[in-house]
Structure formats: C-alpha cells, structure tokens
Amino acid sequence: ASETYLERLWKIFKQATGWDGQGTAPASVTLSTSFGAGENHLGAVGGHTDIIDVTVLMTLHATYVANDFVGLSGVPLTFAGCARKNGGTGLIVSAELIDYALQSVAGELWLFNTPIVPPADSAAWTITDAELLTLVCVIPFSTYYASALNSASPVGNLTYPFKCRATSTSLSGAFVTRGAPAYNSGDVTFRLGVLQD
C-alpha cells in the first residue's frame, strides 16, 4: 500500500532530525507550534453584527425643500467600521433614521464605498457619474413611528452587499430629503446594522 500524507511527512521529519519520536527529543530538534496570522487578530471569521450610529451635522440647519442634500457642505457622512478589516466585505441588514425634531419627512440615505463630495447643504442633490459608480445602495425612509418629542423610521430585512476600499473599513453616506423638514444640526441620527464577513 502507498504511504499516506502523514506517513510521508513523518518519514521526512525523522530523516531531517534523526529523531524517531521515542523519548525526549534531542536539543537539535526544535518543535514550533506558532503560525503567522492572515490578519491582525485571530478568531474572527465573519458573521459578526455591528451597529454604527452617525449623527448628521448641518452647515445651514434651515428649512429644506424636497430633493435637497442635508449635511455639512461638501462633506459626506462616514460610517466607520462597517467592515472587519481594510477592504473587507459585509451586508447592510438594517437601517434606522432617528428624528429628534419630530419632522417625520421622507428621505433617503445614499451609501457609497468611496468618499464622495456632496453639494452644499440645502442645495439640490447632485453627484457625478463616477461617484454614482461607487454606490452601494439607497435606503428610503418613509414610515415613521412618533412619540410626543421625536420619531424613528426603521427599515429591516435589507441585504445590500458592500466591499470597502482597500485602505478603509468605512462607507460614505449622504442624506437626501424628499420633503421640507426644518432641521437643526444634530437633529438626525442614522443607525446602520451591518453583518461583517
């Protein structure tokens, strides 16, 4: 019968070390159980869910009109840590818009795998063709659940795959209103649920 892989490996080991495995190994035989990591940590193999909150700061914090960009002029939202490692992948599984101002107006969160340059705050939502090619998804918010002071629009059962840039674990975002809310800076928080590979 032919040798198995392990039998052949043992034979090579004995020839290289001169040790037959009986008794204590001679000092010339060094056994190592260390191995190099494929990443900076061991043990995480994916399937980890994370919740990432980002509050929208605004330059003008005014009354917006339908189809306006809402945020800091020329500055996208950054959802840091969406992936486990640089260039990592995952799924967006849920999103929630928290409205502290109780405006409860329809809007969208646009997510990209590369930082974009949005228009000025309260300007018409516009992006370039090149930026559109980096689009991961658009998450609409239209149904709100309100208290006397605030409201929330949760969206579940999402399955949007993403892949971050080679040097990043983040996704870039932009908030677009489809109504006419009156927001102050910090009145809106997005909560993103991600399943990391």
Residue ranges and their predicted role:
Residues A1-Q103, V176, P181-D197:
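Extended, low-complexity segments enriched in Ser/Thr/Gly and acidic residues that occur primarily
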Residues V45, L149-Y183, V188:
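Cysteine-clustered segments with highest specificity for TGF-beta superfamily mature ligands
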Residues A66-L72, C82-T89, I116, A146-A152, ...:
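Short linear motifs at secondary-structure transitions and domain/linker junctions
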Residues D99, S104, P118-P119, A146-A148:
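A broad, structure-centric signal for solvent-exposed, well-ordered loop/edge residues
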Residues E108-N113:
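Beta-strand signatures of extracellular beta-sandwich domains
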Residues T114-A123:
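Short aromatic-acidic-glycine turn motif
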Residues S122-T126, L195-D197:
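Extended alpha-helical regions
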Residues T128-K163:
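Extended, solvent-exposed segments with strong compositional bias
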